Amino acid sequence: MREIEENAGNHKILIFSQFLKMLDLIKGHLEKHKIKYEYLDGKTTDRADRVNHFQEDESCRVFLMSLKAGGVGINLTEADYVYLVDPWWNPAVEQQAIDRTHRIGQKKKVFAYRMICKDTIEEKILLLQDKKRDIAKDIISTEDGFLKKLSQNDIIDLFS
């Protein structure tokens, strides 16, 4: 939290967690230190207003989001720091969250951090992510990969 406090003075920050209770803990810390923030989870109804407020209000430094609710369909190009507080088994979901900052209009270099506790299940989740990434890469991009061997008829059969 110390790093987030320090960066909030000069940067706009996205913080993602899959756990709403974790977001509540962070929210309490931000309020204690008088850091203005926005919040979005699956129950948020005024998503566009919250996004616009974060994008347009220079004093609103942090946007707290649930990983699932904030992972798609939102452009947050004012942010230049992204924190993933807890790992998700699917690396694509995390990448989508980070990609909220990589949109047309982004003028700053973006830094993304994954918060991982040593010797915990989080390290095992990272290993699982690496395996998933490797499997996807092998299937899609290698010459011997599954997709490269499919004929046109195979593809038609898959989708019919």
Model-derived features: positions:
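ASCE P-loop NTPase motor core, strongest for the SF2 helicase catalytic module
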Residues: 1-160
